């Protein structure tokens, strides 16, 4: 007889593009994914630019911090989702083709439906 393992959902919201906020979001997202949680990484307009190809790499080699691309890849490998609020595209002058391949551009209302039932929320 097999027991069903309960899957928990963790929501990480990032509305800033500074190193402290972004790295905190990535670290918590990777930690939650490593514990088996389904992770939703939601970036609001203030944090939108970090999902553009080449931006996360700028946070590499920060003293005492892990490699942001390692964290990003870890979350992705463990089925984490990367969601950008659609308002971030025009607000920050981003071209959709410049976003990382894994990024979904969604309305905030769609994200809220996806986040339903989450047991943990973190905002940076």
List the model feature ranges, each with a label.
Residues 59-86:
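A glycine-rich helix N-cap at a beta->alpha junction
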Residues 23-37, 41:
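Histidine-anchored nucleotide/phosphate-binding helix
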Residues 39-44, 82-86:
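Short internal beta-strands
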Residues 58-63, 98-102:
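Short, flexible loop segments at the rims of nucleotide/cofactor-binding pockets, characterized by
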Residues 45-48, 89:
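Short beta-alpha junction loops
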Residues 74-78, 83, 92-99, 104-113, ...:
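A short aromatic-anchored loop/beta-hairpin motif
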Residues 10-23, 55-56:
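Short, glycine-rich nucleotide/cofactor-binding loops
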Residues 47-62:
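N-terminal beta-loop-helix "entrance" segment that forms/cooperates
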């Amino acid at each position: 007889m097999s027991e069903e393992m309960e899957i928990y959902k963790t929501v990480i919201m990032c509305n800033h593009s500074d190193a402290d906020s972004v790295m905190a979001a990535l670290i918590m997202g990777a930690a939650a994914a490593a514990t088996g949680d389904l992770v939703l990484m939601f970036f609001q307009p203030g944090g939108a630019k970090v999902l553009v190809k080449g931006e996360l790499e700028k946070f590499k080699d920060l003293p005492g911090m892990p490699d942001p691309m390692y964290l990003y890849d870890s979350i992705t490998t463990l089925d984490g989702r990367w969601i950008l609020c659609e308002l971030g595209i025009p607000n920050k002058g981003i071209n959709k083709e410049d976003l990382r391949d894994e990024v979904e551009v969604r309305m905030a209302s769609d994200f809220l439906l996806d986040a339903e039932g989450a047991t943990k929320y973190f905002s940076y």
